[in-house]
Structures are given as C-alpha cells and as structure tokens.
C-alpha cells in the first residue's frame, strides 16, 4: 500500500470525477488494491477472472496475489499486476454494491490446485448445491496464521491436518509459486490434484505445455502420478510422522527457466504457528471527551477515533467488546480489529493498537474465556494472541457456515453468548443467496453444530438477550411486515419476511 501525507482524505467522495487529484490518486490505488494496508491476507468474495463466495486472498509481494476458496481449499487463481480491485466496494465507497474483483493478469493453469474427494483423483466430486463448502469429513478450513511476510493456512483433509504457505520466487522471466506443505500423521492416503491436461512426468517434475511443476521432498512414497482422467496428481502416503514438502509451479512461454531449478523451500511449518513478530509497530494516541451535561438520563463520553493512521485504514467502526481488564476491542467494516487502552475517568491518553486485519466485516464481537471472538461473513472467528505481543497470531475458524453468501448486503449481525456457552447471531435474508430467508443462527458451544431458531428476517441488524436467555432481534424496513420492529424469537418461529410459512 502507499502512505499518504497528513492532508489526505481517507473517505472516497461519491463523485470522484470532480474531486481533484488526491481523489483520483486514491481511486487508482483502490483499483489495484494498494490504497490501504489490509494485512497480508484478506477474506472476501472474489469476482472477475477468479470467483469465490468466500476466499482467502494473499499478497505474495511484487504485485503478485494468490487466492483460495475456503469451502474447498481450491486455488481460484494466481495473478500479477495487483491485489484486488476495491474501487466499487465498501472498502472504498460509503455505499457500494460491487465486490472485490480479480481483474488482473491470471497466470495460466494457476487454478488447478485441489484436493481429491475421498483421497482418489478419479472420484467425481458430488454436487452439494446450494452449499459451497465441502462437508467437514472431507475438508475443513481451520484458520490462518500470519508470520512475518508469510501466511500459513491451516485446514484438514479427510481427517489429516494440513499446513500450507504460498511463497513467491522470480526466476528468469517467470513467476514461481511455491506451495510449502506440512502434513500431519495419518493412516489414510491423500491425493492432491496439482494440474489438469495430461502431464508429462519425469521423476519429481512434470510439464504441461509451457507449465512446469517441481516436487521437493525427502519423504519416501511421496510422488507424482497421472490419473486416469488426465490430471497431474501428488500421492501423499500414510505416515506416522509429519511430512514436509514443497510443490513449485511456473508458467513460462519465453522458456527463460528452461533447465533451471527453483530454490528449495521445504519448511517445517509447524514451527511457525506459535506466534510471529509484530507487524504493526505504530500505535496512535488520541484524547477523549468527557460528558459535560448533567441533565441527561445517561452520561455519554466520547473516544476519539484515529481517522488518519499509519495504515490508511478506513475506520468505519462496526463492533466492540470489552476485556475484563477494561481494554476495548473495536472492529471496523473493512476488517480491522483495534485494541484501545486508556479508557478511564479522564480519557486523557487513549491508545489505539492494531490487533488484526483482513476479517470479512466483523459486525459483532465478544470476549469469551479471554479470547476475542467475532462474527464475520461466513464464520465465527477466534483471535488468539499466543505470544502476548498485542497482535493476533491465529485467526481460528471456530465455526464455518456451509452457505457463505457473496451478496454485498448479506451481512451477519451481532454476537450473543447463551448461558450454555452457545453463540447467536443474525443473518440477512434480503439481498441474500442463503436458502433460509434470514434468521437467527444458534451455534453450539464447541462450534460443531448450528441451527436456525427463527427465520423470516430481512436484515436483522441487531440482536439481544433477555435475562431468561430468550433472544430478541430488530429487523428493518418491513417487506410486508412492520418496519423496525423488535421481536422475541424462538425455535421454529417465522417473522414474516421472505417466502417461507414455517421452518421445517
């Protein structure tokens, strides 16, 4: 991203054509994804030359980007020339219906990386529509770890844990993408589809046209094969120990990498998941304002938000939660979480420290057993700070939805915790692809089960909890029901918006 001087405006005007040179510069940076520091990894939908309802998009540096669909862990593409085009999105405009766009130059065959169903590449992947997330006995996204310039993705495939970290290398005129892998022990064989299109395999390398793949491994039994349906497949054998290997991929029509070998990138990724170095070293100090009137039903102090900050973050505050020690966590619509300290009886020195970035619209947070927990689009995320340095080290996918929605207006609202430890949040039905017409979702305390306890909600932009544990909600705008009503929901309730008459 590019830093602006102190005179810059950080909110894009609605009419950029007449907004001056500064706004035009911001528009250009938004179109290539470098207006703001989003962290090295961002969760969002992706459209354009790569498509996903819920993707993890990783900045590899040198204007090179890779993106994974989190429902299948399939790569939807690697591209050069930018990160994502945010110009028509809520990352850049006050109100916008656009989605992050991968409109850049996609590397040929960079979207073939996918795990085989039931461990065999010849197996046909079943149609799971309307779901877009594989069942968890096949694959589960567990979260990701930022570690310096690296992003380490954690997931499980047919019961075996996997750590994967992509890395960029320039070789000749080509871009080489390394997939560094650590696989947990397990008694079942896994198969990873690396490329399509009938490969020519020679030992630990394979070619398809101008595309080349190298396997770097010291593990016996780990090898390439060509499947019956013409795919380049990596066989991963059963093992009693961790398996470390690297798969490097390049596409080069200039043949500048002919007879060259990429650098060895085998790494023990398990050694990088207990906390990395701090990334955001600049804290911001503001001064709050105490309430002055004594003739009010309540007192309202004001905490000043650092609208101008070292990361060009757009501080569209969207959620908050207090820690037991009085610190405040503040989420923003573009995906940041900041920790705010100095909230006391004078507010003379309020300090803002960036804690996390790249979340998908955190619109509700709670501190549960000391861990900051957020509802985002597609999942409930727990943010773990393992080394107590003030930054999240693991973005744990505590609960994954099986129908994440890409609609720009299909929000998940608020987070409440029940007496039994279960979680509740409101999910939009209007402007949504969800097969339920909006509802309150209940997630078990262990994150393994979810149920809808009330449906027929257009945009439930607020939920609450009564002393007896019942859940209240506020819907908006009507849609043939009273606008801005407050309801008490219950299992099997239907609140009138949408097309259902009952919850089956």
Task: Describe each PLM feature range.
Residues 139, 162-167, 229-235, 303-305:
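Short structured motifs
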Residues 177-185:
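Short, well-ordered beta-strand segments enriched in hydrophobic/aromatic residues
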Residues 210-280:
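Extended acidic/polar, glycine-enriched regions
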Residues 1-176, 189-198, 202-211:
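Beta-strand-rich N-terminal accessory domains
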Residues 185-187, 194-196, 228, 248-251:
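Long, charge-rich, low-complexity alpha-helical segments
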Residues 1-49, 251-301:
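N-terminal pre-domain segments of enzymes
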Residues 18, 68, 242-244, 460:
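Aromatic-residue-lined binding/catalytic grooves and analogous aromatic/hydrophobic interfacial grooves
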Residues 257-504:
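Beta-propeller domains with acidic blade repeats across secreted/periplasmic ectodomains
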């Amino acid at each position: 991203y590019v830093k602006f001087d102190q005179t810059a405006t950080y909110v894009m005007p609605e009419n950029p054509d007449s907004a001056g040179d500064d706004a035009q510069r911001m528009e250009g940076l938004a179109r290539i994804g470098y207006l703001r520091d989003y962290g090295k990894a961002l969760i969002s939908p992706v459209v354009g030359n790569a498509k996903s309802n819920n993707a993890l998009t990783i900045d590899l540096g040198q204007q090179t980007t890779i993106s994974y669909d989190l429902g299948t862990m399939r790569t939807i593409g690697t591209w050069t020339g930018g990160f994502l085009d945010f110009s028509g999105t809520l990352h850049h405009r006050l109100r916008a219906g656009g989605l992050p766009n991968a409109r850049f130059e996609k590397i040929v065959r960079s979207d073939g990386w996918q795990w085989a169903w039931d461990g065999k590449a010849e197996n046909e992947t079943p149609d799971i529509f309307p779901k877009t997330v594989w069942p968890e006995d096949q694959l589960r996204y567990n979260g990701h770890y930022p570690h310096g310039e690296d992003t380490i993705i954690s997931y499980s495939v047919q019961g075996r844990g996997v750590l994967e970290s992509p890395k960029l290398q320039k070789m000749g005129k080509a871009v080489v993408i390394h997939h560094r892998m650590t696989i947990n022990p397990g008694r079942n064989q896994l198969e990873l589809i690396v490329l399509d299109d009938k490969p020519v395999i020679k030992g630990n390398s394979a070619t398809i046209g101008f595309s080349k793949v190298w396997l770097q491994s010291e593990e016996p039994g780990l090898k390439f094969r060509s499947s019956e349906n013409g795919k380049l497949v990596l066989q991963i054998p059963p093992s009693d120990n961790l398996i470390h290997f690297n798969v490097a991929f390049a596409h080069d029509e200039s043949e500048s990498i002919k007879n060259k070998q990429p650098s060895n990138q085998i790494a023990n990724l398990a050694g990088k998941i207990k906390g990395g170095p701090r990334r955001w070293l600049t804290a911001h100090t503001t001064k709050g304002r105490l309430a002055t009137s004594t003739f009010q039903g309540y007192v309202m102090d004001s905490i000043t938000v650092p609208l101008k900050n070292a990361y060009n973050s757009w501080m569209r505050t969207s959620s908050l939660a207090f820690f037991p020690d009085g610190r405040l966590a503040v989420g923003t619509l573009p995906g940041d979480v900041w920790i705010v300290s100095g909230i006391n009886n004078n507010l003379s020195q309020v300090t803002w420290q960036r804690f996390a970035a790249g979340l998908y619209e955190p619109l509700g947070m709670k501190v549960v057993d000391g861990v900051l927990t957020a509802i985002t689009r597609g999942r409930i995320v727990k943010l773990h700070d393992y080394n107590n340095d003030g930054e999240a080290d693991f973005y744990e996918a505590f609960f994954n939805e099986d129908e994440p929605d890409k609609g720009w207006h299909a929000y998940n609202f608020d987070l409440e915790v029940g007496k039994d430890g279960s979680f509740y949040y409101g999910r939009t039905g209007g402007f949504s692809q969800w097969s339920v017409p909006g509802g309150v979702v209940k997630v078990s305390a262990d994150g393994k089960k979810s149920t809808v306890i009330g449906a027929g909600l257009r945009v439930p932009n607020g939920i609450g909890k009564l002393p007896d544990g019942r859940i209240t909600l506020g819907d908006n705008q009507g849609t043939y029901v009273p606008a801005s009503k407050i309801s008490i929901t219950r299992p099997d309730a239907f609140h009138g918006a949408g097309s259902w008459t009952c919850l089956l």
